[in-house]
């Protein structure tokens, strides 16, 4: 039950429709390999949540409509969130970044851009990182053709 509760929060955070700057549709299947706790430390340690993530997958669908979805293998929740953006940056073999903008004050004058998912496509094995509060997860992806 605790696992489902954590993954539901994860899904609420990630399973969103958001603007995309994509030229064509692309799909990645990503699998978590390790999870670290980074709170107040220069030396990340293995997270207690590792068993809830490792081995589980996230599918990242980026379409040209312009929308994108992130779907985990044990949950499906969709939520509108205009502060989420997926973008492609770099050279010919570009990496994909899903980031959100947090408004730090009531007036919205202080903002912070936070990377949630980063998929590196310029290496032979596609790697991704996923940030959730003080948790940093890493894994590998396959591009679905």
Segments and roles (model prediction):
Residues 31-72, 108-116:
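Short, solvent-exposed loop/hinge segments that bridge or flank secondary-structure elements
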Residues 28, 139-140:
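Extracellular secreted precursors and ectodomains with disulfide-bonded cysteine-rich loops/domains
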Residues 69-109:
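Contiguous, well-ordered beta-strand patches that form the walls/edges
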């Amino acid at each position: 039950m605790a696992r489902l509760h954590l993954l539901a929060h994860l899904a609420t955070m990630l399973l969103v429709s958001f603007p995309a700057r994509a030229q064509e549709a692309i799909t990645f299947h990503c699998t978590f390999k390790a999870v670290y706790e980074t709170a107040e430390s220069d030396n990340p340690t293995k997270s207690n949540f590792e068993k809830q993530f490792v081995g589980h997958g996230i599918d990242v669908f980026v379409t040209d409509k312009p929308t994108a979805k992130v779907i985990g293998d044990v949950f499906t929740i969709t939520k509108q969130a205009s502060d989420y953006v997926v973008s492609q940056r770099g050279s010919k073999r570009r990496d994909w970044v899903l980031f959100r903008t947090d408004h730090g004050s009531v007036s919205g004058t202080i903002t912070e851009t936070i990377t949630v998912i980063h998929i590196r496509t310029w290496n032979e094995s596609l790697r991704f990182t996923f940030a959730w509060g003080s948790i940093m997860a890493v894994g590998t992806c396959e591009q679905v053709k």
